[in-house]
């Protein structure tokens, strides 16, 4: 080993965007992302999750094969890829394919032009996923050359290119359009609103020549020549080297054979506890490293492990072959191989599959009980594995391997062999998986794979099973298993209903989830469903086919009512989950206030796509910067007796721990404060009050060291003399634990409820519904950088929606004047309310550490900590009593509402008025309520997009649907009957109702729900359900009313001597397009001084970052009205400037802008103006209206829901920027889909969040949005009291997503009706939020298969 030790100082050499970098003295555990962001100027790749689950960090990695003289390139997660494994590789980031200096790439320009970037944090990763998919398609052989300007990629491939990338802002539709614009098989006219041609205008036709030019990947060199030369040179040197091990960097070893691996591992160089064996390291996304490792053995360069051997017997795949490579290999094989490849393509995401290895997946399943799809599928296919332990090599079945005790690090998986089942017509091979996402990164609840050899019985047409293999995956067992008892039973049987029924009964005894498994009954039901589907396919008549003549009213062409006409296509057997995404946008453009009203691109979108846009964590670390990570309590109510650290490499990196004692003497222990709602503690003092509460901040030299050290903390708790924690609303009620609602925030009841109930023909007493929480999942986690300054001053760069309150809190905590604290926020990588009060804690903790240590301190929360501490949306329990007439007219409603607010008030006292405000969209006759804010020992809940309104609107729909079900009438009839007329609207909403001409809800609702198109679609749904047993559809139309408040707002406009313009506003750019609208307003307001009406000024305007020492009384960014109020403040500033400049303009006549400003400057005209706009006291709020129709398809066997189509009509007033408002509508709607359907926020018995990462918390992805997504923005009427007659768009459209939940209820009702004859359940049922797959399946019936089979068997 002498030569290896001597070589240990060799540098890892990589090329980054064509530049050479040597990594010397780098921690061997350094990831590529960490290296890029700390050792290079690159900032495009972002840390979004650290799990390979979000795509924010995606880069393209290129490798050079000097022997073949070939470069291969693929996308990869830089957060998982270790730098030490990339010696002599090239890395290309978003900056490398295009930037502001060298010119933007077509991908970047199209993402910008299709309005596909909002907060922009995810955009560089999106960009590289798309770029990689284009490069792969264009290099593929056998594909025809595409027309000029297009790629070889297909529209279907383009959609899947970003299937693993998360975006919380856009709703994905514009991203999909940008992707598909490269595909030659797409109709450009079908693409959505963009900046390249004006849709809906006769002389503006879609044309490839109008799109930014694309000429393949030739313009970007991903592998520089100098690196090729180095590789060739190193090969020559290696030929004379007797060592079989290559050593790079500090602690990286690359054995070249299996034998050398064992010799190396058994040497005295390694301590098994600190060495890590890696091939791709993607497993660390699932099983996080709990400590640092100082040595790594990279087995990916062992040729035998990457070999692929084909023969007549099958294919042998080396253990380090990537999943993507395996898919490519198997796709060229027989039917069984192709089916395996198809299933593997649904595992992980493209950028993970490109590096994750087949062997690594199997090893995790065997050693760590990983929920592997691959193990299940290969098990059913009869695969064997070759393993080597020391000098002993053996070939055993995969089943035997999985059953063995967990293998140790010395056991090397060499290869996996899959037999070739040939073209035997008697072989049937099927695979199944149920996961929250069809294509995205989601572990399945259950997966299964079945292989049978059978022959057809001539008399019955059913199959005689000769042999069968039934494999089932992660249902709560340690690993995939074969259902041997069931297999034994089935062999020799002719498949029939009685046989399947008995097989199902046997299976339920085999599939037994371990204790503690989530949704155990659902998982068993899934296993039964999959066996049923498989065996039914081998019968004649039992597996009832979908009616091939049932029309599909969801995917249509043409327009009707401003949406889409319903020329029905024929329903096919294509899985609706994989239908292509279609869309249409309708809106009215106005030139009245140009450039206000133009759908211009979002300011900075191209910079966001290239990765040049600077977020807080992109700011270069100051000299001597330290890094912090929270140590938090895992107990909800306990004395903190002490904090220690385990003896580990990570704990050795701790510099200090900042705690309560480090707050200055004159300071206070506050982590957030509100003059009206109270304070929340920054540190535990001395009793933890909830799981997730901050105990202290670990300080270390790097962010990774801080993260890892925090994991090594050991907290000593004591619950002596403490009461049990209050965790639920039921606990709070029992202990009378409540916060008070200030009188000025309390909603007002309407009418006399008791009298209203006495007038009712029917009554529902104590109806109930529950709504759970939702996590923000902004792509950029909480982050701050604190830099101490002279004279006890401090500057903080914070990702915050409340810079002013952050300043106040930091100052109070440190005991210094407010003017000593400067908060700067340029842009926020997603907020949704989560960067409001919750961001203050991080900033304040950072400030305390920096103030104490007199050094800069930076904190960037890891995703798990962020999710645990964030709080999220308020969960609540609702009970209601409602009276109504026989015709459906409601007479009175009383609601008992218990809201889980957490440990502090935060924004909770403002929730009741919001809930009631959204609830009042219907005329309830009389409305009363009893709302309690429950104080509990959980992290305080905070504002999340449409806080309270989202729940209130849904509660109204749940009640209306209950009434409709009770009366057995169409729900829309109840909705329409109880919509307000203007008189009742005024009673319920007062001044917010505005003028009669602005009340557009009835018109909108009738446009959708009363249209012939809707009636036809409803009939199609009913017809479909009559012909489909195992898939049911539902359609629903939901109206919304949303009350928004106008707030005072400052604005400042400064004209420079060259005519360029700097604008400051109190609001923060969080992706909502604030800067864009402000630019347009500035140009409009100053436009009367210009001959072109101000359009030429757009490029001269720059909106600068929020700075609390420059712009005081900035208020907060939230409530959906920040953009319009900021615009009005700017307009007011501009008006003053215009008055000063007008005399010069009038005197000179025609005068270019630059000359006008030059003359004004010479004349000493003041060229800056600060204004503070306040709303008219008689008009401080207004109502927003909209409605949505959603149509869904529910798989009765699995609970999976596909949103076939959503049609949204939203009254946006006279839009300040239709492109921005459209993006807000679509993004809010999709975020709402997550809340109502799929985002499962789960805690343990101590209230600690356990769905704490991308592996367990599933926000919507490109494959879960509506397959047809139509949006119409309407302008109901002028209203001079609003800002240029505009309306808010950020939050109200989220409420429309309840239409999906309501449509799901209709589909479930159809399923329950279908099986009513077999002991089905009531057609009136409670359906809580979110309606996840397990909930949907349970409501459809966990035992529908058994009941159906019993029915068939009885007829046999």
From Swiss-Prot:
Task: Name the cofactor(s).
Answer: [2Fe-2S] cluster; FAD; Mo-molybdopterin
Quick one: which residues bind [2Fe-2S] cluster?
A: 49, 54, 57, 79
Q: Which reaction does it catalyse?
A: an aldehyde + O2 + H2O = a carboxylate + H2O2 + H(+)
Q: Where is the FAD-binding PCMH-type domain?
A: 245-437
Biological process according to GO:
abscisic acid biosynthetic process; auxin biosynthetic process
What keywords were assigned to this record? 2Fe-2S, Abscisic acid biosynthesis, Auxin biosynthesis, FAD, Flavoprotein, Iron, Iron-sulfur, Metal-binding, Molybdenum, NAD, Oxidoreductase
EC number assigned by the record: 1.2.3.1
**Coiled-coil regions in this chain?**
none
Q: Which Pfam families match?
A: Ald_Xan_dh_C (PF01315), CO_deh_flav_C (PF03450), FAD_binding_5 (PF00941), Fer2 (PF00111), Fer2_2 (PF01799), MoCoBD_1 (PF02738), MoCoBD_2 (PF20256)
Recorded hits in InterPro entries, A to Z, give: 2Fe-2S-bd, 2Fe-2S-bd_dom_sf, 2Fe-2S_ferredoxin-like_sf, 2Fe-2S_ferredoxin-type, 2Fe2S_fd_BS, Ald_Oxase/Xan_DH_a/b, Ald_Oxase/Xan_DH_a/b_sf, Ald_Oxase/xanthine_DH-like
Record keyword Flavoprotein present: yes
Q: Write down the SMART domains for this protein, in alphabetical order.
A: Ald_Xan_dh_C, CO_deh_flav_C
What is this protein's record name? Answer: Probable aldehyde oxidase 3
Q: Which SUPFAM superfamilies match?
A: 2Fe-2S ferredoxin-like, CO dehydrogenase flavoprotein C-terminal domain-like, CO dehydrogenase ISP C-domain like, CO dehydrogenase molybdoprotein N-domain-like, FAD-binding/transporter-associated domain-like, Molybdenum cofactor-binding domain
Q: Which PANTHER family match?
A: ALDEHYDE OXIDASE 1-RELATED, XANTHINE DEHYDROGENASE
What would you give as a GO molecular function for this chain, any one?
A: 2 iron, 2 sulfur cluster binding
For the 2Fe-2S ferredoxin-type domain, which residue ranges apply? 10-97
Q: Which family does it belong to?
A: Belongs to the xanthine dehydrogenase family.
Region described as Disordered: spans on this chain: 552-576
Q: How does it assemble?
A: Aldehyde oxidases (AO) are homodimers and heterodimers of AO subunits.
The annotation note on the cofactor reads: Binds 2 [2Fe-2S] clusters.
Could you tell me which species this protein originates from?
Answer: Oryza sativa subsp. japonica (Rice)
């Amino acid at each position: 080993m002498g030569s290896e030790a001597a070589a240990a100082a060799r540098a890892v050499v990589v090329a980054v965007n064509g530049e050479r970098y040597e990594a010397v003295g780098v921690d061997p555990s350094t990831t590529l992302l960490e290296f890029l962001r700390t050792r290079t100027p690159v900032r495009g790749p972002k840390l979004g999750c650290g799990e390979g689950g979000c795509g924010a960090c995606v880069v393209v990695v290129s490798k050079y094969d000097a022997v073949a003289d070939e470069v291969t390139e693929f996308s990869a997660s830089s957060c998982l890829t270790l730098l030490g494994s990339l010696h002599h590789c090239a890395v290309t980031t978003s900056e490398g394919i295009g930037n502001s200096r060298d010119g933007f790439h077509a991908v970047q320009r199209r993402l910008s032009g299709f309005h596909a970037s909002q907060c922009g944090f995810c955009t560089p990763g999106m960009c590289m996923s798309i770029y990689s998919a284009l490069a792969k398609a264009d290099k593929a052989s056998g594909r025809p050359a595409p027309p000029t300007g297009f790629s070889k990629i297909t529209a279907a491939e383009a959609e899947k290119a970003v299937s693993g990338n998360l975006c919380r802002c856009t709703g994905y539709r514009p991203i999909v359009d940008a992707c598909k614009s490269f595909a030659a098989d797409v109709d450009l006219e079908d693409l959505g609103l963009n900046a390249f041609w004006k849709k809906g205008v006769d002389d503006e036709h879609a044309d490839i020549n109008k799109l930014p030019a694309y000429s393949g990947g030739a313009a970007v060199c991903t592998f520089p020549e100098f690196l090729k030369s180095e590789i060739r040179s190193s090969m020559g040197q290696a030929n004379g080297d007797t060592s079989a091990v290559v050593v790079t960097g500090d602690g990286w070893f690359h054995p070249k054979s299996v034998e050398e691996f064992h010799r190396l591992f058994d040497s005295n160089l390694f301590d098994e506890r600190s060495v890590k064996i890696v091939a791709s390291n993607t497993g660390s996304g699932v099983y996080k490293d709990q400590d640092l490792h100082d040595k790594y053995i990279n087995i990916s360069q062992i040729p035998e492990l990457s070999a692929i051997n084909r023969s007549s017997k099958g294919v042998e795949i080396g253990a380090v072959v990537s999943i993507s490579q395996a898919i490519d290999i198997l796709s060229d094989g027989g039917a069984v191989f192709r089916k395996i490849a198809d299933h593997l393509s649904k595992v992980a995401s493209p950028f993970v599959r490109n590096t994750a290895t087949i062997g690594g997946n199997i090893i995790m399943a065997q050693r760590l009980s990983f929920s592997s799809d691959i193990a299940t599928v290969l098990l059913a296919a009869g695969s064997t594995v070759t393993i080597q332990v020391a000098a002993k090599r053996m070939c055993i079945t995969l089943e035997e391997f999985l059953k063995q005790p967990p293998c140790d690090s010395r056991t090397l998986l060499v290869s996996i062999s899959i037999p070739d089942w040939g073209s035997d017509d008697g072989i049937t091979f099927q695979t199944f998986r149920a996961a929250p996402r069809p294509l995205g990164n989601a572990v399945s609840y259950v997966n299964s794979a079945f292989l049978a050899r059978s022959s057809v019985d001539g008399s019955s047409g059913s199959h005689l099973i000769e042999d069968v293999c039934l494999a089932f995956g992660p249902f709560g067992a340690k690993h995939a298993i074969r259902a041997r008892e069931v297999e034994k039973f089935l062999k020799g049987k002719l498949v029939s209903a009685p046989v399947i029924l008995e097989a199902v009964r046997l299976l339920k005894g085999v599939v037994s989830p371990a204790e503690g498994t989530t949704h155990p009954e659902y998982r068993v039901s899934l296993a039964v469903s999959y066996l049923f589907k498989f065996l039914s396919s081998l019968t004649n008549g039992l597996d009832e086919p979908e009616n091939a003549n049932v029309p599909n009213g969801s995917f249509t062409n043409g327009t009707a009512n401003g949406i889409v006409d319903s020329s029905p296509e024929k329903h096919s057997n294509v899985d609706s989950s994989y239908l292509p995404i279609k869309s249409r946008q309708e809106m009215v453009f106005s030139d009245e206030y140009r450039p206000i009203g133009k759908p211009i691109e979002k300011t900075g979108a191209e910079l966001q796509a290239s990765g040049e846009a600077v977020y807080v964590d992109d700011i270069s670390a100051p000299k001597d910067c330290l890094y912090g990570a929270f140590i938090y309590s895992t107990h909800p109510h306990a004395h903190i007796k002490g904090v220690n650290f385990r003896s580990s490499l990570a704990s050795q990196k701790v510099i200090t721990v900042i705690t309560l004692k480090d707050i200055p003497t004159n300071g206070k222990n506050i982590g957030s404060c509100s003059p009206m709602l109270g304070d929340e503690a920054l540190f535990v003092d001395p009793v933890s009050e909830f799981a997730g509460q901050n105990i202290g901040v670990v300080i270390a030299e790097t962010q990774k060291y801080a993260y890892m050290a925090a994991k090594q903390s050991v907290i000593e708790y004591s619950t002596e003399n403490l009461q049990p924690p209050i965790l639920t609303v039921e606990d709070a009620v029992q202990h009378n634990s409540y916060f008070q609602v200030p009188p000025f925030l309390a909603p007002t009841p309407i009418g006399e409820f008791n009298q209203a109930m006495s007038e009712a023909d029917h009554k529902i007493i104590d109806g109930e519904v529950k709504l759970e929480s939702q996590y923000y999942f902004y792509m950029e986690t909480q982050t701050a950088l604190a830099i101490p300054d002279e004279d006890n001053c401090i500057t903080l760069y914070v990702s915050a929606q409340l810079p002013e309150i952050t300043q106040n809190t930091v100052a109070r905590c440190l005991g210094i004047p407010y003017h000593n604290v400067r908060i700067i926020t340029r842009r926020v990588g997603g907020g949704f309310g989560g960067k409001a009060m919750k961001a203050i804690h991080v900033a304040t903790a950072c400030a305390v550490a920096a103030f104490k240590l007199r050094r800069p301190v930076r904190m960037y929360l890891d995703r798990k900590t962020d999710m645990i501490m964030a709080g999220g949306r308020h969960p609540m329990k609702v009970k209601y009593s409602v009276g109504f007439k026989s015709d459906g007219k409601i007479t009175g409603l009383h609601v008992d509402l218990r809201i889980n607010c957490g440990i502090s008030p935060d924004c909770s006292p403002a929730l009741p008025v919001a809930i009631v405000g959204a609830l009042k969209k219907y005329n309830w006759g009389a409305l009363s309520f009893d709302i309690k804010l429950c104080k509990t020992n959980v992290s305080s809940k905070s504002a999340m997009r449409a806080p309270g309104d989202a729940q209130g609107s849904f509660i109204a729909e749940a009640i209306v649907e209950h009434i409709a079900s009770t009366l057995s009438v169409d729900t829309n009839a109840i909705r329409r009957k109880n919509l307000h007329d203007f008189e009742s609207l005024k009673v319920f909403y007062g001044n917010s109702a505005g003028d009669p001409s602005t009340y557009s809800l009835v018109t909108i609702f009738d446009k959708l729900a009363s249209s012939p198109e809707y009636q036809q679609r409803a009939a199609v749904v009913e017809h479909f359900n009559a012909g489909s047993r195992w898939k049911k559809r539902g359609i629903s139309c939901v109206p919304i009313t949303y009350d928004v408040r106008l707030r005072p707002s400052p604005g400042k406009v400064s004209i420079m001597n060259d005519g360029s313009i700097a604008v400051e506003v109190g609001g923060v750019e969080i992706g909502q397009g604030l800067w864009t609208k402000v630019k347009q307003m500035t140009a409009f307001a100053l436009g009367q001084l210009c001959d072109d009406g101000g359009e030429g000024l757009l490029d001269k305007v720059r909106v600068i970052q929020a700075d609390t020492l420059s712009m005081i009384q900035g208020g907060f960014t939230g409530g959906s009205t920040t953009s319009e109020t900021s615009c009005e403040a700017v307009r007011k500033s501009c008006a003053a400037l215009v008055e000063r400049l007008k005399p010069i303009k009038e005197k000179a006549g025609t005068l270019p802008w630059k000359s006008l400003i030059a003359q004004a400057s010479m004349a000493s005209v003041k060229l800056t103006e600060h204004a503070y706009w306040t709303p008219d006291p008689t008009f401080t709020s207004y109502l927003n209206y909209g409605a949505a129709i959603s149509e869904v398809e529910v798989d009765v066997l699995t609970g999976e829901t596909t949103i076939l189509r959503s049609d949204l009509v939203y009254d946006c007033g006279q839009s300040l920027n239709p492109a921005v408002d459209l993006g807000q509508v679509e993004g809010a709607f999709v975020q709402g889909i997550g809340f109502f359907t799929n985002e499962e926020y789960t805690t343990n018995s101590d209230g600690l969040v356990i769905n704490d990462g991308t592996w367990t918390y599933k926000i919507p992805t490109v494959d879960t949005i509506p397959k047809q997504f139509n949006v119409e923005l309407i302008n109901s009427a002028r209203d001079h009291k609003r800002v240029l007659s505009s309306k808010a768009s950020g939050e109200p459209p989220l409420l429309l997503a309840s239409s999906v939940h309501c449509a799901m209820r209709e589909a479930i009702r159809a399923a329950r009706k279908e099986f009513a004859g077999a002991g089905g359940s009531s057609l009136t049922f409670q359906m809580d939020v979110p309606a996840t797959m397990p909930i949907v399946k349970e409501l459809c019936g966990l035992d529908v298969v058994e009941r159906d089979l019993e029915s068939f068997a009885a007829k046999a």
